[in-house]
Amino acid sequence: MDSDFYRAYLLHRRPYSDSQVMLDMLVEGVGQLRMLARISGRQATKHKAQLQPFQALLVHYNGKYDLKYINKFELHGTPLFLKGDELYCGFYLNELTNRIVPINEPIDQVFQLYNTHLKNLNSGANLQAVLRSYEFQLLELLGYGVDFSFDASGEPIDEKRTYSYFAEVGFLVQDDPRSGFSGLQLNAIANHDFSQADVLYMAKQLSRYLLKPLLGNKPLKSRELFAASQ
């Protein structure tokens, strides 16, 4: 393998011109990059077939500015075949990553995090648990992680108490145990242990709250597709 080739996954693609496509790629050791690839000539059909989601690629690119240019690319390993709910979850991973990971900022650990969780979708694991694990770890990498060890007053999270979460404040103890997060649930979320249904449910509520400022008002298409399929 050429030393200038990088492992990458396609997150999003769209037409750019009659002979070029614009690609948002997650590149190992680099982060998310926006690239142009020429798709024309006798190899056009082959190249279009290779530029698919969930297929690991080796890409060779150049360009000093925001937009990079792919010189060569080739398949790397066998494609990951997702179907049913696995496929919708894969689309969600791609769209979420594409939307909240900054382009052209060096966040080198995102590729490995994505690669691991993408493969976990195809492993028979609880799909919702895989998504929650990815969301919380991705938020941590991007600097939006939550401190699950201490509440807003600096006291350790107590498994027997109930908490509410407030952005830029943290967890505050509340008196009503019928709502909010139990300390036991928070400790489980911190350890990415989503084996209990109540923990998985509360983790989803918290992750959506944390992701909303990053996603803005534009809905995720993958969520809409999944909802329509049910």
From Swiss-Prot:
Keywords noted in UniProt: DNA damage, DNA recombination, DNA repair
Function as written in the Swiss-Prot or TrEMBL entry: Involved in DNA repair and RecF pathway recombination.
Chain segments annotated as transmembrane: none
GO biological process, one term: double-strand break repair
Keyword Disulfide bond: no
Protein family: Belongs to the RecO family.
Name this protein carries in UniProt: DNA repair protein RecO
GO cellular component: bacterial nucleoid
Organism: Pseudoalteromonas translucida (strain TAC 125)
Gene transcribed to yield this protein: recO
Keyword Nucleus found: no
